[in-house]
Regions:
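Generic beta-sheet signal
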Residues: 57-61, 88, 147-155
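Active-site beta-loop-alpha junctions enriched in small/polar residues
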Residues: 95-97, 129, 156
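Short acidic, glycine/serine/threonine-rich loops at helix termini
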Residues: 22, 72-74, 100-104, 161-166
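Cofactor-binding active-site loop characterized by glycine-rich and histidine/acidic residues
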Residues: 1-82
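A short alpha/beta connector and helix-capping loop motif
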Residues: 70-95, 150-152
Length: 186
């Protein structure tokens, strides 16, 4: 993912990395979930298939907190807990912002942790900017007790970039050359 061509053409016509990923097996993107909420449903299906066919693989689904406003997320979460999809791992970027407002303004999630716990998930909350916490969570995930697991990573959108930190402008925007030059040293 560090290839300069990929990043140079991010969210552009002909680029391989869009705002919502397109399926690209070479890049490790097995499914495109441009319609928010679909990714967890697909992840549940793949997870169930692996378990039924005794295939020892894990399924990772990455969600944004705004995506957790979608009803399909909660139907899938309930399904995963009920069917004990222990090979399913979800990572939620919980930055409390969406493309057009804060999560609380648009549709508050209240306690994301309690919601997943009530659906019979293992729930881990971490500081999404602390790499030690993120690495240590991997050890806990190995001790999975026959439930799906969710990591809720509390983050700040655009953290460390003064003109983007905690702003809506950073949601769909590509850095200009001058903006990139300003942050290279950070």
């Amino acid at each position: 993912f560090s290839d300069k061509f990929l990043m140079k053409n991010y969210i552009s016509n002909g680029g391989l990395l869009g705002g919502h990923p397109d399926r690209n097996i070479k890049l490790g993107i097995d499914y495109c979930s441009g319609s928010l909420g679909n990714g967890l449903s697909v992840g549940c299906g793949v997870s169930l298939s692996y378990l039924k066919n005794k295939i020892n693989k894990k399924v990772l689904v990455i969600l944004g907190d705004g995506e957790c406003n979608e009803g399909m997320i909660w139907e899938s979460a309930l399904f995963a807990g009920h069917h004990k999809l222990s090979n399913l791992f979800v990572f939620v970027d919980y930055n409390r912002q969406q493309g057009f407002g804060t999560t609380d303004e648009i549709l508050g999630l209240d306690s994301l942790k309690q919601k997943f716990q009530s659906f019979k998930w293992n729930v881990y909350e971490v500081n999404g900017h602390n790499f030690k916490e993120l690495i240590n969570i991997k050890k806990k995930l190995k001790k999975n007790n026959k439930k799906p697991s969710v990591i809720i990573a509390n983050t700040i959108k655009g953290k460390g970039v003064p003109f983007y930190e905690n702003t809506f402008e950073s949601h769909y925007k590509i850095l200009s050359k001058s903006e990139f030059e300003k942050i290279k040293h950070l």
